[in-house]
Amino acid sequence: MDLEEIRKKKLEELKKEEAKRKLLEQLESNVMQYLTSEAKQRLYNIKMAHPEKYELALQILYRVIQQTPTIIDDTTLKKLLAKLFQKREPKIRFIRK
């Protein structure tokens, strides 16, 4: 690989990251209009602790708000997040011969 190819790849990566960041900002601005201050605070805490989960939660919230544009309070957000990120218990089976 020569220097020019490396630059092109890096430039493409930067463009993709910028597009993703803009989409995330747009989602965030749309969703935040429908959240109470407590729900916003909870979502920001998730953003700091788990950025991947934050992005997923934003996408889900956006879809929910599109279907039923109502104000989402903290308890509703908690319920939604609990369903979204519930831990799955591994099922262990014992097979006896």
UniProtKB/Swiss-Prot annotation:
Pfam families: dsDNA_bind (PF01984)
Keywords, sorted A to Z: DNA-binding
Tagged with keyword Ion transport: no
Family matches, as InterPro entries: PDCD5-like (IPR002836), PDCD5-like_sf (IPR036883)
Molecular function per GO: DNA binding
Record keyword DNA-binding present: yes
Similarity section: Belongs to the PDCD5 family.
Name of protein: DNA-binding protein NEQ150
Lineage: Archaea, Nanobdellota, Candidatus Nanoarchaeia, Nanoarchaeales, Nanoarchaeaceae
